[in-house]
Amino acid sequence: MTSQEIEELDLGTKKEEVILTTHNEINQYLNGELLVIEHGYVEVRLRTTPEMVADKHGLIHGGFIFSAADYAAMAAVNETNVVLIASECQFLSPVKLHDEVNIIARVRHKEGRKRNVNVVAFMHDIKVFEGEFKTVILDKHVLKLKLLDENEETAVGTKKKRG
């Protein structure tokens, strides 16, 4: 028996297994490895690699940190058609080659189809990133949506009506 199973027996509780239902095709080598997933909560670990380096000093480009944080936010919401609509982020400390960044994402607020997710990233005990991610859950995949009606399409020149 594992220590978690023993603890669950002692507490009389068993954690429900949560299966990731979004972003299943993502490259975890570049976007972070999903370590823990619970309802509204995930932990991701990003191991920095030479492909992420921005300069000769080994600085990791912030886009990789953001991408891992975004992945964590989407996984915390864990809805098939979740998309990011806005974020406000702070990069608090640099990350370098071979650092491991641990990312924690928690859903903080739910309103209809909207979810706000707080994401923090640490390297050891140093906070390197913090962000608020605003997401929305769509009825279908974002690439399957018809975003413009026929009149708007004609106005922007993407589709011409023939009479």
Q: Which functions belong to the PLM regions below?
A:
Residues 54-58, 85, 140-141:
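A short, polar/proline- and glycine-enriched secondary-structure boundary/capping micro-motif
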Residues 44, 87-91, 105, 119, ...:
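A structural signal for short, well-ordered beta-strand segments
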Residues 14-24, 71-80:
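Short, solvent-exposed helix-to-loop capping segments enriched in aromatics
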Residues 1-13, 81, 96-97, 108-163:
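HotDog/MaoC-like acyl-thioester-processing domains
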Residues 24-60:
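Catalytic strand-loop segment that frames the active site of acyl-thioester-processing enzymes
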Residues 28-30, 40-42, 83-87, 99-101, ...:
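A generic structural signal for short beta-strands and their flanking turns/coil linkers
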Residues 53-66, 70, 74:
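Compact, glycine-rich, soluble single-domain proteins
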Residues 71-101, 107:
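Hydrophobic beta-strand-centered segment that forms part of the acyl-chain substrate-binding groove
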